[in-house]
Structure formats: structure tokens, C-alpha cells
Amino acid sequence: MSESHSFIVSQSLEGIRLLEFLATKLPLYSINTLKGLIEKGSVSVNTKRASAGLALGEGDEVAVSIPEGARRYEPHPVPLEVLFEDGHVLAVNKPTGLAVIPERGEIEATLIGGLLHYLQNLSPLSRGKGLRPRLVHRLDKDTSGVLLVAKDPEAERHLSGQFEGRVIEKEYVALVDGRVEREEATINLPLEETTRGKMRPSPRGKEAVTQYKIQERFNGFTLLKVMPKTGRTHQIRVHLKAIGHPLSIDPLYGNRSAIFLSSLKADYKPKKGQTETPIISRLTLHAHKITFEPLPGVGKMTVEAPMAEDMDRLIRVLRKYKGSG
């Protein structure tokens, strides 16, 4: 007997590719299974057959028919730092380098596999209840920090509604290149996707709004508190680049892929014959706080993810060798 599902793309997932969207909404099924369903025409977008790479828009309707016996994705243990949990909502501190959903096949560990394992086997509130994680927003693989997950359809609808209504407040910590002069500002630049999968500012694009405040200045760098008001793909990264201050590490939109001590400390050189290890080699972006209403009518709460170890180490080094900018 086949299993049918229908989803409406929320604003928080606008711009996501069809295959990634299905993996987000149907995490129990393997990537290869979902690819096969798309190729066989068992998936439609707005009643039309679609390709795996189709970028979805807010309000698109995705319908899926899954045949009996379709291969499911297996849960697997992943070290998880649980920041908040009740019977309906889970917030975890996603480590950098861990993809939320499978990106290249099904070999690497993923957050979704770890969440499945946690809910089924470890959660004191949910194990044995048959619940599965329902993603309501995303973090890039190389971004660390707090991620909200719904446990049931009601919580998924409630959280998604808060994202769509811009009720949820998100706060990131970002290290960017150069000295940012304005203490605080709002970046209001519509974004559109290029043919190569990158995002760029464009008057033809969709509304994208980001606020920032300066936390600390260093010689050649600035530490920002960043509050995105919309949830476009790569929004923070593209907006910061647009004002001339890209993330200090961003291989896609910035100037480097790693930061080494030798680039910060003038007299430092690695020992002869040794290869220097970078202080940090991922996006200098951390999802620090999220404020939301876990259940209707109970009031807002804030969940905070401690600064990731590599980001914290980098900031300490900057304070020591790059002083105040």
C-alpha cells in the first residue's frame, strides 16, 4: 500500500532544492529512494513533474507518493548537545562540519540520522513513542549553533508559522573582514539565485533583511551580532559581502578558506618540516540564540548555544595579537 504526503513550502525553507526539501520532510527515507521517486514521477510540484534540483518557492505544493517497501534511512548515533527539550520541541547545538541531511550519498553521519537515533533510543521524553524529527529551518554544514526541531505535526505547524510570520528571532555571531564603521545598521537587499547555485543581490530578487550590531573590533576584522529578519538561502553571507565585509572564512563568497596563526602573529613561523594547522577552517558564523514560542499561548523563550570551540579560540587569538581595531 502506497503512502501519500503533501507539503507546502514555508518561507523558512524558500529556495531549497526539491531533493533537499524531501530529505528534510521525509528523513526516514534514504536519499537514493527520494531520488528514485522524483525520477519515476512520484513527486510533483504544483501538480507538475519536477527535477531533483528544482529550487522551490514559498507556497509551492509538493506531493509525494511512496510505494510500500521503499528503502528507509537508518538512524545512527551522533554526539548531540541538547539545549532544550519538551514533549513537542527539541533544540540542539549543531557542531560545525555535520550536515543536517545527507549531501553526497548516505555514508557520512548527519544530524538528521543522529536526531532519529536520539528520539528513538535516548530522549527521556520521546523514546519508544515513534516520533521523528521535523526540520523547520536550516543551518549550513559549516555553521555551528542552535537548531530547532519539531517532534510532531502540531509543533511543526506552530514553529513554521512563527518563521513565516517573522515571530521567531535569530541571532548569529559573525567574524568579518575589515573594519565595519557603522555601529549598527539594517541591510535591505533582495536576493536571487544565480545559475550556478549562488545567491546575489538583485532588484528582481526576493525580500531579504538583515540587521547587525558591532560587538568588537580587531585590527583587520570585526565581530558582529547579526539578526536576520528573513530566511533566504545564504542571506547573511551574501549581505555581509554586499557591504564590503564578507565572513572572514567563506570559500563561496569570501576571500579565504582558513585562518592560520602565522597570518595573525607577525613573528610566528611553524617549525621546520611541520605543516601549520589552521586555527579555524570553516565559516566564521555561529547561530548563537533563537527566541520562539514552544507552544501556543505559553509565551516566548530563548535558547542559547555556547560559542563553538574553534570560534572562541579564534576570538581569543585576535584579542591577543590583533588588539582593538
Predicted segments, located by residue:
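Pseudouridine synthases involved in rRNA/tRNA modification
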Residues: 1-36, 206, 216-219, 229, ...
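RNA pseudouridine synthases
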Residues: 1-196, 209, 307-320
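Short histidine-centered loop motifs in beta-beta connectors
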Residues: 47-49, 213, 219-220, 224-227
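Short, surface-exposed secondary-structure edge patches
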Residues: 51-55, 225, 282
